């Protein structure tokens, strides 16, 4: 029998009495109880069917029909007779199409299709079934908000969820909306998603791709007409196609699993009010205000704004859909999003969550000098509430001078990309904020500075990511991180080649003239790529990351971290040849987005054509006069510097004058240059006397810093050698008070040594007196030991010599074994007085074997054998041979890695009598020495000496010829 339908009641009315809440709770309880009862009855009926059916018998149509009918009738739902119609040949009563499109049959078919394969297939696909199940799980038993549902205590377990109505075959989208199911049709006319896309393939594509495949395509896009026609506003507010929610409607957004792309952006868990965002394209066109400057503003008129605001507070459906299916309309919006470049303007919701409210969104058009709209945030979508975080500098309400329209074109970009499809490289390359966002890197001469300030305010708005929220985070580094993805799409547009060209700008025209001036010479010297980098025209598919494009800064380049390797203040970045910034962008502290092709100093970015010709031409002989105007540049080059040094040795007076005039203004810079310092040294040698003197004057007041510099110290040494005495004295005096610092410095110690060598002793007394009391300490220093040796060589003052030698001789044993002090002792043995050598040898006597086995002291013992007298040498040899016939000290020395060299030195320096004695002792142990690594050295030396002695003896035994 037909089950009577209860009256349809709305979920909420503004003037309901207080008893509605109690009725509502009772209704919920009845529904829950009925659902449990239906489940129990269904289980019992299934068991009964299994009892009357043989396990081996195939399923029959009648059995399936009775089972299904019993489920529908016994379960309290509408029986199969409800569908009416004549019994067809398939065994089912009622209209076949009406029967097969019912969601209850769909669920039954997929649950029992294996038991009865003769069941006719339903009209809905599995995909539609999953959608219905999602809606059922999301809506539970309450249905959609504002729908008209049937309240029936006898619903079947397999009936459609509350809120679904079996619509007529010709039901339009507006009829579905009346039932609260926006954009979802489950009847016989329902199309699958594949059908929708295939049907939509015939529609013309009106949008251009947002990512051109090449740079040429990109240039064509940016040069195209940027005027936004009213018909183009149809795509405004299209949702991001992150899931099927954008295709099926807002009901899918009620899924318990939120879209990960919208988690951080959804302001509250409330449902989007049905009907609040449903505005047809025609309505949008009718309600859009026209700008007085022929630009399209995104704001609706006041009455429409009021209607939208009030509709956002209403929970009932409001209608207002297009005539075509809502699913197809949503699919078109998906396509509009994916190809969202509309003549240079993208009107897609940048926040990427399924927003059903198409509230007004603004656009910054080059022809629209009134900047309204651009709410920048869809957080308050559908609520009709204004953004509470809007700050007073927001560009939404700025009326800019039309004269700055050309500035707005490249300053703001057009937001082509959504954060979902942004370029990762542009995001990572973002630093504090590009100078172009602060108001532009270049200001036309005819534009007022106040308008530039307005542009700066627009840039400040963009620095907040377009969200309207103030910078309330305490950590500036985190604030930068938070807005990386928000501004990545702007960066791609800011890296547009037209940004660098900026056609029509007077300042850029001037730079173009400068560039053309050197273009003929520098055209063949394109900006070099880093070694190993591919010569590609784009990066990650973005045409803005090709050659000669703006180069973004690093996110680590923070003004609070000047020592960061990626900071603009880092030595790494300062020393990078290719990273030179235009003058217009040098005053900004964060990441600088300077052009790779240098605008401010063109000469620094490219090598001179003269220098390149010199290095590439191996056959032509150049002269100094031919490089006039390029001397400094040649001096800083490896090959150019060598060329100048060679030519200065034989240069004429005119050539020397030419070189002198060019290097003098850059003399200090060349002195510290890796190649330029050699040119300065050579000019000190071969320059004219007046020129050398004037060049020496450049050193005054710079001696100390140059002495501590790697290349400057060489220039100071050469100057001390060749300049006049008065200049030498003046230069040396600058070291007073810094002597010990220079002595311990790896560069300064060479300057101190040169002062001791070239400056008279009476003029460097302040240097020598500094060493008194520190001779031993300096003798054990890697650089100080060299200075002490120069003092012993060039300071002949008896008082100075006695003081220095007294400290050395008092610690001979310690200095002899020191890795640096041993050089000082060797120097005394070689250049000292005989009595000083005798004191040292006597100090070492009795410890010769021990000292010979020590690495550093063995060198001192060798010097004692070399420079000692015969008596001193005999004393050392006797100690080595020992007092017994076994010669134990000699055997130990011959097998030692260091002492074996001392034994070899003895065989070289001793007289014949001592050599014969030593050889006799060594021959006894010759076979045993061959087994030791270091003993082999002694064996080889002995064999040579024996062979030489035998030859000498043979020559002596020959009869002497008679003299006539």
UniProtKB/Swiss-Prot annotation:
<dbReference type="InterPro" id="IPR033133">
    <property type="entry name" value="PUM-HD"/>
</dbReference>
<feature type="region of interest" description="Disordered">
    <location>
        <begin position="256"/>
        <end position="300"/>
    </location>
</feature>
<feature type="compositionally biased region" description="Polar residues">
    <location>
        <begin position="223"/>
        <end position="234"/>
    </location>
</feature>
<keyword id="KW-0963">Cytoplasm</keyword>
<dbReference type="InterPro" id="IPR012940">
    <property type="entry name" value="NABP"/>
</dbReference>
<feature type="repeat" description="Pumilio 2">
    <location>
        <begin position="662"/>
        <end position="697"/>
    </location>
</feature>
<keyword id="KW-0597">Phosphoprotein</keyword>
<feature type="repeat" description="Pumilio 3">
    <location>
        <begin position="698"/>
        <end position="733"/>
    </location>
</feature>
<feature type="region of interest" description="Disordered">
    <location>
        <begin position="343"/>
        <end position="388"/>
    </location>
</feature>
<feature type="repeat" description="Pumilio 5">
    <location>
        <begin position="770"/>
        <end position="806"/>
    </location>
</feature>
<keyword id="KW-0677">Repeat</keyword>
<feature type="region of interest" description="Disordered">
    <location>
        <begin position="1"/>
        <end position="22"/>
    </location>
</feature>
<dbReference type="InterPro" id="IPR001313">
    <property type="entry name" value="Pumilio_RNA-bd_rpt"/>
</dbReference>
<feature type="repeat" description="Pumilio 8">
    <location>
        <begin position="879"/>
        <end position="920"/>
    </location>
</feature>
<feature type="repeat" description="Pumilio 1">
    <location>
        <begin position="626"/>
        <end position="661"/>
    </location>
</feature>
<dbReference type="GO" id="GO:0003729">
    <property type="term" value="F:mRNA binding"/>
</dbReference>
<feature type="domain" description="PUM-HD">
    <location>
        <begin position="606"/>
        <end position="946"/>
    </location>
</feature>
<feature type="region of interest" description="Disordered">
    <location>
        <begin position="204"/>
        <end position="235"/>
    </location>
</feature>
<dbReference type="InterPro" id="IPR011989">
    <property type="entry name" value="ARM-like"/>
</dbReference>
<feature type="repeat" description="Pumilio 6">
    <location>
        <begin position="807"/>
        <end position="842"/>
    </location>
</feature>
<dbReference type="InterPro" id="IPR016024">
    <property type="entry name" value="ARM-type_fold"/>
</dbReference>
<dbReference type="InterPro" id="IPR033712">
    <property type="entry name" value="Pumilio_RNA-bd"/>
</dbReference>
<feature type="repeat" description="Pumilio 7">
    <location>
        <begin position="843"/>
        <end position="878"/>
    </location>
</feature>
<dbReference type="Pfam" id="PF00806">
    <property type="entry name" value="PUF"/>
</dbReference>
<feature type="modified residue" description="Phosphothreonine">
    <location>
        <position position="257"/>
    </location>
</feature>
<protein>
    <recommendedName>
        <fullName>Pumilio homolog 3</fullName>
    </recommendedName>
</protein>
<feature type="repeat" description="Pumilio 4">
    <location>
        <begin position="734"/>
        <end position="769"/>
    </location>
</feature>
<dbReference type="Pfam" id="PF07990">
    <property type="entry name" value="NABP"/>
</dbReference>
<comment type="function">
    <text>Sequence-specific RNA-binding protein that regulates translation and mRNA stability by binding the 3'-UTR of target mRNAs. Binds the APUM-binding elements (APBEs) in the 3'-UTR mRNA sequence of CLV1, PNH, WUS and FAS2.</text>
</comment>
<feature type="compositionally biased region" description="Polar residues">
    <location>
        <begin position="287"/>
        <end position="300"/>
    </location>
</feature>
<keyword id="KW-0810">Translation regulation</keyword>
<feature type="modified residue" description="Phosphoserine">
    <location>
        <position position="192"/>
    </location>
</feature>
<dbReference type="GO" id="GO:0006417">
    <property type="term" value="P:regulation of translation"/>
</dbReference>
<feature type="compositionally biased region" description="Polar residues">
    <location>
        <begin position="356"/>
        <end position="384"/>
    </location>
</feature>
<dbReference type="GO" id="GO:0005737">
    <property type="term" value="C:cytoplasm"/>
</dbReference>
<keyword id="KW-0694">RNA-binding</keyword>
<feature type="compositionally biased region" description="Polar residues">
    <location>
        <begin position="207"/>
        <end position="216"/>
    </location>
</feature>
């Amino acid at each position: 029998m037909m089950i009577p339908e209860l009256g349809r009641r709305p979920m909420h009315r503004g003037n309901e009495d207080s008893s509605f809440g109690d009725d509502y709770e009772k209704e919920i309880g009845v529904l829950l109880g009925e659902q449990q009862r239906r489940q129990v009855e269904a289980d019992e009926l299934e068991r009964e069917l299994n009892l009357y059916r043989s396990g081996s018998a195939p399923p029959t149509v009648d059995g399936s029909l009775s089972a299904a009918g019993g489920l529908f009738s016994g379960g309290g739902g509408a029986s199969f007779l409800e569908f009416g119609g004549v019994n067809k040949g398939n065994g089912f009563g009622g209209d076949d199409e009406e029967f097969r499109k019912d969601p209850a049959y769909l669920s039954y078919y997929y649950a029992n299709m294996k038991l009865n394969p003769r069941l006719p297939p339903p009209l809905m696909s599995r995909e539609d079934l999953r959608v219905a199940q999602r809606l059922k799980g999301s809506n539970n038993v309450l249905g959609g908000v504002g729908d008209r549902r049937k309240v029936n205590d006898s619903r079947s377990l397999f009936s459609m969820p509350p809120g679904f109505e079996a619509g007529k075959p010709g039901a339009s989208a507006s009829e579905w909306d009346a039932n609260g199911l926006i954009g979802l049709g489950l009847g016989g006319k329902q199309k699958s998603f594949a059908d929708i896309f295939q049907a939509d393939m015939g529609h013309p594509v009106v949008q251009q791709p947002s990512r051109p495949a090449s740079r040429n395509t990109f240039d064509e896009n940016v040069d195209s007409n940027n005027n936004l026609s009213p018909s183009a506003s149809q795509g405004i507010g299209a949702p991001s196609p992150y899931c099927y929610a954008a295709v099926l409607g807002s009901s899918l957004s009620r899924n318990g699993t939120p879209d990960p792309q919208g988690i951080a952006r959804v302001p509250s868990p409330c449902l989007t009010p049905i009907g609040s965002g449903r505005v047809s394209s025609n309505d949008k066109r009718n309600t859009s205000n026209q700008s007085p400057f022929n630009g399209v503003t995104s704001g609706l008129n006041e009455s429409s704004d009021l209607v939208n605001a009030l509709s956002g507070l209403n929970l009932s459906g409001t209608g207002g859909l297009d005539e075509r299916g809502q699913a197809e309309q949503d699919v078109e919006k998906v396509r509009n999003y994916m190809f969202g470049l509309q003549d240079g303007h993208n009107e897609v919701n940048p926040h990427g969550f399924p927003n059903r409210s198409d509230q007004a969104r603004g656009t910054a058009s080059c022809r629209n000098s009134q900047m309204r709209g651009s709410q920048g945030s869809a957080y308050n979508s559908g609520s009709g509430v204004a953004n509470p975080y809007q700050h007073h500098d927001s560009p939404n309400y700025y009326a800019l001078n039309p004269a700055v329209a050309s500035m707005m074109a490249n300053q703001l970009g057009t937001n082509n990309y959504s954060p979902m499809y942004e370029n990762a490289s542009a995001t990572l390359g973002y630093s504090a904020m590009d100078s172009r966002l602060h108001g532009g890197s270049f200001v036309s001469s005819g534009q007022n500075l106040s308008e530039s300030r307005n542009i700066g305010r627009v840039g400040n708005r963009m620095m907040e990511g377009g969200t309207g929220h103030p910078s309330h985070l305490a950590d500036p580094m985190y604030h930068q991180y938070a807005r990386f993805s928000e501004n990545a799409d702007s960066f791609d547009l800011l890296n547009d080649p037209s940004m660098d060209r900026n056609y029509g700008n007077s300042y850029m025209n001037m730079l173009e003239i400068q560039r053309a001036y050197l273009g003929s010479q520098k055209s063949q010297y394109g900006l070099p790529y880093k070694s190993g980098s591919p010569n590609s025209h784009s990066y990650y598919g973005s045409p803005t990351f090709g050659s000669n494009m703006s180069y973004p800064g690093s996110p680590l380049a923070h003004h609070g971290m000047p020592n960061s390797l990626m900071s603009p203040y880092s030595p790494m970045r300062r020393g990078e040849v290719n990273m030179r910034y235009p003058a217009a962008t040098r005053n900004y502290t964060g990441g600088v987005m300077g052009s790779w092709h240098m605008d401010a100093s063109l000469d620094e970015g490219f090598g001179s054509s003269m220098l390149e010709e010199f290095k590439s031409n191996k056959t032509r002989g150049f002269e100094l006069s031919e490089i006039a105007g390029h001397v400094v540049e040649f001096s800083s080059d490896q090959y150019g510097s060598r060329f100048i040094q060679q030519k200065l040795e034989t240069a004429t007076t005119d050539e020397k004058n030419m070189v002198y005039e060019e290097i003098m203004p850059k003399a200090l810079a060349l002195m510290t240059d890796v190649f330029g310092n050699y040119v300065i040294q050579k000019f000190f040698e071969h320059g004219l006397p007046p020129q050398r003197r004037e060049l020496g004057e450049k050193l005054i007041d710079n001696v100390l810093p140059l002495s501590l510099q790697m290349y400057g110290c060489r220039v100071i040494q050469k100057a001390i050698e060749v300049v006049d005495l008065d200049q030498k004295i003046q230069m040396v005096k600058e070291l007073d008070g810094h002597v010990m610092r220079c002595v311990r410095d790896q560069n300064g110690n060479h300057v101190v040594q040169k002062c001791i060598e070239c400056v008279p002793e009476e003029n460097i007394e302040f240097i020598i007196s500094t060493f008194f009391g520190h001779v031993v300490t300096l003798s054990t220093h890697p650089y100080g030991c060299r200075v002490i040796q120069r003092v012993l060589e060039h300071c002949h003052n008896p008082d100075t010599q006695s003081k220095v030698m007294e400290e050395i001789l008092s610690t001979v044993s310690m200095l002899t074994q020191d890795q640096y002090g041993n050089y000082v002792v060797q120097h005394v043995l070689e250049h000292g007085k005989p009595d000083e050598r005798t004191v040292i040898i006597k100090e070492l006597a009795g410890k010769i074997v021990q000292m010979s086995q020590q690495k550093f002291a063995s060198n001192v013992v060798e010097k004692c054998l070399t420079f000692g007298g015969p008596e001193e040498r005999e004393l050392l040899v006797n100690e080595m041979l020992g007092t017994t016939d076994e010669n134990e000290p000699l055997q130990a020395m011959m097998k030692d890695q260091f002492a074996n060299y001392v034994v070899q030195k003895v065989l070289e320096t001793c007289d014949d009598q001592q050599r014969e004695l030593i050889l006799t002792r060594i021959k006894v142990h010759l076979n045993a020495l061959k087994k030791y690594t270091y003993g082999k050295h002694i064996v080889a030396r002995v064999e040579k000496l024996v062979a030489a002695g035998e030859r000498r003896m043979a020559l002596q035994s020959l009869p002497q010829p008679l003299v006539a």
